[in-house]
């Protein structure tokens, strides 16, 4: 059975998951953090046991070498040759990539060229790709893009009402993100509903520290809440979501900050952190709200309220909806947020059971059996989607 590794490289981190394919059995997973520092942390889980090591890891190539050596040392693989495919998460594929792609010198250059669209993420993803090429040069590698699933959006969804030449010259448009997650949970929802995805109108709510909503009709994304960048859409942990663009020069004028500094505030100091003044972590906010902290309660209402509005908007866009899906850290685990989001949607045919809504972190229907619109909790699995694409594109199946 081929072994395939799914990789998510950040600027100073490397997440990994090793699969036996096509059974999709997870052999091990882990993360290398603080790459580039003397006190880098190597975490790996084997047979449910977590192993942690603190050691200097100067760069991603060293992290990759260490990871592979560790797999042999722990007896997970006998030799590097057992790894037959590598899948890399790449945040931005622009308009160039509407599907995952086998990485060649040419496609790698194209991914690098897209870095101005995702300056925080794509360069780190490229570093991860190059590190694996250095250590395992002959193993086929596949890039899986966060944006690819949303490339089916029609122009009316992805165009901004700006001068049209900005789109033609600079590629300014809505791209959307979390595509691999939205694709996984909508495909899984169709399986759980026992209906062909081609017949379904689904609304997928990926709610983590970053959050996005997607309208998926017939298995294709037709609209999503994030935009040209992951800053757009609903309020998030530290991101503002949609605001009036004229606020940017106004804040600059009032505070003396530069445009870059204001964008940094919108990305890192806004959202629920900005509203509460103390945390972007939903668990802290729910705890504070339960103790009567009014700003914490307000942050929850703002967060859930924006999601609630997107659901109404996307239901209108698709002339109805068959199921609403909650996924990612908050979507899978917070019954409080789900309840606030779903409150008042009975007019649309959404009837949910408060007892079933107590579920955390596992697949479940939380709607009543008679509810015309089903509501599901589905833990996302982006890594398995990456592994499946490696099998498909590297012809390992």
UniProtKB/Swiss-Prot annotation:
Listed pathway(s): Metabolic intermediate biosynthesis; acetyl-CoA biosynthesis; acetyl-CoA from acetate: step 1/2
GO MF annotation terms: acetate kinase activity; ATP binding; magnesium ion binding
Binding-site residues, Mg(2+): 8, 382
Q: How is the cofactor bound?
A: Mg(2+). Can also accept Mn(2+).
Q: Which residues bind ATP?
A: 15, 206-210, 281-283, 329-333
Q: Which positions in this protein are listed as binding substrate?
A: 89
Task: Determine if Disulfide bond is one of this entry's keywords.
Answer: no
Question: So where's the catalytic machinery, residue-wise?
Answer: 146 (proton donor/acceptor)
- GO biological process entries: acetate metabolic process; acetyl-CoA biosynthetic process
State its Enzyme Commission number(s).
2.7.2.1
Annotated CDD domains: ASKHA_NBD_AcK_PK (cd24010)
Q: Where is this site: Transition state stabilizer?
A: 178, 239
The record's subcellular location field reads:
Cytoplasm
- What are the names of the required cofactors? Mg(2+); Mn(2+)
InterPro entries, alphabetized = Ac/propionate_kinase, Aliphatic_acid_kin_short-chain, Aliphatic_acid_kinase_CS, ATPase_NBD
Which controlled-vocabulary keywords does the entry list? ATP-binding, Cytoplasm, Kinase, Magnesium, Metal-binding, Nucleotide-binding, Transferase
Give Gene Ontology CC terms.
cytoplasm
Give the catalysed reaction(s), semicolon-separated: acetate + ATP = acetyl phosphate + ADP
* Described function: Catalyzes the formation of acetyl phosphate from acetate and ATP. Can also catalyze the reverse reaction.
Which proteins does it associate with, and in what oligomeric form? Homodimer.
User: What family does this chain come from, according to its entry?
Assistant: Belongs to the acetokinase family.
Designated name of the protein: Acetate kinase
């Amino acid at each position: 059975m081929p072994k395939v590794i799914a990789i998510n490289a950040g600027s100073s981190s490397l997440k990994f998951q090793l699969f036996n394919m096509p059974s999709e059995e997870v052999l091990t997973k882990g993360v290398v953090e603080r790459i580039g520092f003397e006190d880098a942390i190597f975490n790996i889980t084997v047979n449910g046991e977590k192993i942690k090591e603190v050691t200097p890891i100067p760069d991603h190539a060293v992290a990759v070498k260490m990871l592979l050596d560790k797999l042999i040392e722990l007896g997970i693989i006998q030799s590097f040759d057992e790894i037959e495919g590598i899948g890399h998460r790449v945040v931005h594929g622009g308009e160039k990539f509407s599907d995952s792609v086998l990485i060649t010198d040419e496609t790698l250059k194209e991914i690098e060229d897209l870095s101005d669209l995702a300056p925080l993420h794509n360069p780190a993803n490229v570093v991860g790709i190059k590190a694996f090429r250095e250590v395992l040069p002959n193993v086929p590698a596949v890039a899986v893009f966060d944006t690819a699933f949303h490339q089916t959006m029609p122009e009316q969804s992805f165009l901004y009402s700006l001068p049209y030449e900005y789109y033609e010259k600079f590629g300014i448009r809505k791209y959307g993100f979390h595509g691999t997650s939205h694709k996984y949970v909508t495909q899984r929802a169709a399986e759980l509903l026992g209906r062909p995805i081609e017949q379904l109108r689904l609304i997928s709510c990926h709610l983590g520290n970053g959050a996005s909503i997607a309208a998926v009709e017939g298995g294709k994304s037709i609209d999503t809440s994030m935009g040209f960048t992951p800053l757009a859409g609903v309020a998030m942990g530290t991101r503002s979501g949609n605001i009036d663009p004229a606020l940017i020069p106004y804040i600059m004028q009032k505070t003396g900050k530069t445009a870059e500094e204001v964008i940094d505030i919108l990305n890192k100091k806004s959202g629920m952190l900005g509203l509460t003044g103390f945390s972007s972590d939903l668990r802290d906010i729910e705890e504070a709200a339960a103790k009567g902290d009014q700003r914490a309660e307000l942050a929850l209402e703002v967060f859930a309220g924006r999601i609630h509005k997107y659901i109404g908007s996307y239901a209108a866009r698709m002339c109805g909806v068959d199921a609403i899906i909650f996924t990612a850290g908050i979507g899978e685990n917070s019954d409080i947020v789900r309840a606030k989001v779903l409150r008042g949607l009975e007019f649309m045919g959404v009837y949910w059971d408060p007892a079933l809504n107590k579920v955390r972190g596992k697949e479940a229907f939380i709607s009543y059996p008679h509810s015309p619109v089903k509501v599901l909790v589905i833990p996302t699995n982006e890594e398995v989607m990456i592994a499946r694409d490696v099998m498909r594109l590297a012809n390992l199946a």
